[in-house]
Amino acid sequence: MERKDFETWLDNISVTFLSLTDLQKNETLDHLISLSGAVQLRHLSNNLETLLKRDFLKLLPLELSFYLLKWLDPQTLLTCCLVSKQWNKVISACTEVWQTACKSLGWQIDDSVQDALHWKKVYLKAILRMKQLEDHEAFETSSLIGHSARVYALYYKDGLLCTGSDDLSAKLWDVSTGQCVYGIQTHTCAAVKFDEQKLVTGSFDNTVACWEWSSGARTQHFRGHTGAVFSVDYNDELDILVSGSADFTVKVWALSAGTCLNTLTGHTEWVTKVVLQKCKVKSLLHSPGDYILLSADKYEIKIWPIGREINCKCLKTLSVSEDRSICLQPRLHFDGKYIVCSSALGLYQWDFASYDILRVIKTPEIANLALLGFGDIFALLFDNRYLYILDLRTESLISRWPLPEYRKSKRGSSFLAGEASWLNGLDGHNDTGLVFATSMPDHSIHLVLWKEHG
């Protein structure tokens, strides 16, 4: 049949076919199929798949495809990547879905990076790290050996760990190598804090001292407490040192001169923690940039003015029970915006702007967890047997790590958290270095460290 005659015939057949009922159309198709050979059936098979199984992700505009993909959970997205090369190409090009997937795991996101493939790789790395946390495979342990008596004072900063001991020495360790950088003779150490040049120690001999790392010389001696000094903090900009003692007082000292500027009274228990920190919010009593002095005992947290006024009054007292029936666990977190402390009732978070309790986080499956670190996404907690990671968004424990029988100080001075930036969200780079350190009965230091990505 000539092409022109065929086209005329096909037009007539089409008009007739359209006039048939659905049943008649089906019978016509069945008859035509029965008359078809292999070439026609193959052609029919290829075209039917395209007509009946339309690839909407391929046919839709890219903007609409991205919009639909945003409704899928990350695991489904990964499954969809296996459907075809085209699906993998489209899904792997959607920056927003992979950034959202990373955020769902508590990952920090730099929105300025718009490379979708980069974020997909970050997500795959993230789920591997989260799986390691769930399977107790994210950490490894190490020990520091060098002291000959109990170690009751620890302080960590920028990869360096300072340990103060009853053997009348303080040592500075490089955590990454396990090597002792400095070792100097001191008094007994109940609290330590250091920087590149100096070490400040609070002692069971009721004094505070300042030492020079390079020479080991004592450059200042602060006398005035009548009980052991359990906590120290200082600020070079203010030229102020503060100390908390078993004599129930907080003392404010001139760091360079060594003179006592003020004695703050009001505590009725050992003062186990003092903190000097800049305020980051406008509060009822402070403005952003103001320095804040906090002190804590086993029942109360007190907020003080920093000044030289004699007999100055406490600005605010925080507690979890008015009748003192509930004790606060040692360790206090204050980042300028929130105050966080643990108790038998749970983890208490106060808003520093209003001093109101924002929330109480309870872990009913495990009671009496002590606080080590607190961030935007995660909190680090522990008890006598395990180290725990708490997801603050869901208030659920997502990981635990076994601990040996360590020496646990009631004041909280013999254990600490290491690097803290990951508590605000992992980013693929900040899950390195020290996680936790504690002193042991054999006078060594037990370290828990992030394991390198496998």
Curated annotation (Swiss-Prot):
<keyword id="KW-0007">Acetylation</keyword>
<comment type="subunit">
    <text>Directly interacts with SKP1 and CUL1.</text>
</comment>
<comment type="function">
    <text>Substrate-recognition component of the SCF (SKP1-CUL1-F-box protein)-type E3 ubiquitin ligase complex.</text>
</comment>
<dbReference type="Pfam" id="PF12937">
    <property type="entry name" value="F-box-like"/>
</dbReference>
<dbReference type="InterPro" id="IPR015943">
    <property type="entry name" value="WD40/YVTN_repeat-like_dom_sf"/>
</dbReference>
<protein>
    <recommendedName>
        <fullName>F-box/WD repeat-containing protein 2</fullName>
    </recommendedName>
</protein>
<dbReference type="InterPro" id="IPR019775">
    <property type="entry name" value="WD40_repeat_CS"/>
</dbReference>
<feature type="modified residue" description="N6-acetyllysine">
    <location>
        <position position="298"/>
    </location>
</feature>
<dbReference type="InterPro" id="IPR001810">
    <property type="entry name" value="F-box_dom"/>
</dbReference>
<feature type="repeat" description="WD 4">
    <location>
        <begin position="276"/>
        <end position="314"/>
    </location>
</feature>
<dbReference type="Pfam" id="PF00400">
    <property type="entry name" value="WD40"/>
</dbReference>
<feature type="repeat" description="WD 3">
    <location>
        <begin position="224"/>
        <end position="265"/>
    </location>
</feature>
<keyword id="KW-0853">WD repeat</keyword>
<dbReference type="InterPro" id="IPR020472">
    <property type="entry name" value="G-protein_beta_WD-40_rep"/>
</dbReference>
<feature type="repeat" description="WD 2">
    <location>
        <begin position="185"/>
        <end position="221"/>
    </location>
</feature>
<keyword id="KW-0677">Repeat</keyword>
<dbReference type="InterPro" id="IPR001680">
    <property type="entry name" value="WD40_rpt"/>
</dbReference>
<dbReference type="InterPro" id="IPR036322">
    <property type="entry name" value="WD40_repeat_dom_sf"/>
</dbReference>
<feature type="repeat" description="WD 1">
    <location>
        <begin position="146"/>
        <end position="183"/>
    </location>
</feature>
<dbReference type="InterPro" id="IPR036047">
    <property type="entry name" value="F-box-like_dom_sf"/>
</dbReference>
<feature type="domain" description="F-box">
    <location>
        <begin position="54"/>
        <end position="101"/>
    </location>
</feature>
<keyword id="KW-0833">Ubl conjugation pathway</keyword>
<dbReference type="InterPro" id="IPR042627">
    <property type="entry name" value="FBXW2"/>
</dbReference>
